Amino acid sequence: MKRLMANHKQKKAILIALAAPLMFSPAPLMAVTGTSEPVVAIARQAQTIVSVQQINPTTVDVVFSNNQRMTFDFYGDNIFRMFQDNNGGILRDPEAKPEARILVDTPRRPVSKLDIQDDNGQVTITTGKVRLQLDKSTALLKVTNLTTNKIVFEETKPVVYEKGKTILTLKENPDEYFYGGGVQNGRFSHKGKAIAIENQNSWTDVGMASPTPFYWSTNGYGFMWYTFKQGKYDFGATEKNTVKLSHDTDYLDVFYMINDSQIGRAHV
């Protein structure tokens, strides 16, 4: 009995010693467990923005306190790409086997102007049609359509990077509805539901045969995750008033299209 108690205390001390670096280290770590499979710690977006710079006529880099950076690349006055690879990767096309493409040959349109302001605890990036606002203390993004002066979407949580998975969280409005995702058999409007972005080769009810990583919102924006990886879009099914978007990729690469017409939101 005494030997069992001694072994128990020894194991407890070892677990505490292993847990200490996880509790106090600021960097993303992998928790060590007694099993052969590691538990992956969640790596959230940096909490603060330290600088912003325009690197070419259409592209802006935002630098965070952990030296990671997010790139905003404008494909027109109302279309922008948001990219972040914490492993140091640069803007690129997603890999596909067999080889495939998502964008058309000439996806860019003229950007009439690109203005950057960094003051009052906020970074503001403005074109002739949209305004992007980033809170410097949280890095949360809010986007306004300057034609209607309406906030079309805003983040409610920082971007989350897990091993092999990236998650975006947006606010859902009570009168907002969502459509798209490709062929989602038996479903048309996705409010209050979750849809899988994966080819299940199923033509039955609730099956997926031709998914697309794109949806549009009646609030005035279209969204496309620039990837061929599987994903899941949750439009308030798990958490009310919350849109949770995720794909099985370790970097962020998405397009937003801001427009007050349905046709405009459906074009990249």
Regions from the language model: what does each represent?
Residues R3-L15:
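Bacterial N-terminal signal peptides that target proteins for export
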Residues Q10-K12, M23, N86:
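Compositionally biased, intrinsically disordered low-complexity segments enriched
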Residues L15-A17, A43:
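Residues marking helix boundaries in flexible regions
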Residues A17-S25:
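Bacterial N-terminal signal peptides
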Residues A31-R265:
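N-terminal accessory segment at the very beginning of proteins
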